[in-house]
Amino acid sequence: NLESFTNGAPGTGISSGTGTVFKSSVQRVGGIIKTSLLIDLTGLASSTTDLDIIGVGAGAAYLGQITAAKNGTILTGRMTCLEVPAGGADDVDLYAATEANGVFDAGIGTLAETALVTAAGAWTLGLTKGLSAIPAANQYLYLCGGEAGTAATYTAGKFLIQLEGYEA
């Protein structure tokens, strides 16, 4: 059984990026639920401040919401670099937050947040990093710049985020 991720599209701070691609799927097999998110950062931007949210404009810049009904109880996950980020910050982190109102250029720390993947340096092609924490049900996923000083629009950068859980 294949479905799309969450109850709708990502926030407009992601979906309105020129050239930005966001695709998702949720696969249920025998009580195991696999959620996959594919994002091309092209057209989104990073700011000059470490841990600011990646996106565009003033709209919410979340990738989507994790729910137990749709994505199950998450047990593990990973983030894989499919194309090295260029233009914007090449140190990209994944966070979860309880709020859906995080916007581009705002600090993720202004939300009730949890770091899921902290790159701690530039991503390289094929690099995979496991989740250091598990997103709770009803949290929203955000990408953040993991370094200061790179205020620019992305011209490249593709990631696959995979979450695995079970039916609650």
Question: Could you describe each region identified by the protein language model?
Answer:
Residues 1-168:
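Surface-exposed, low-hydrophobicity beta-strand/loop segments enriched in small/polar/acidic residues
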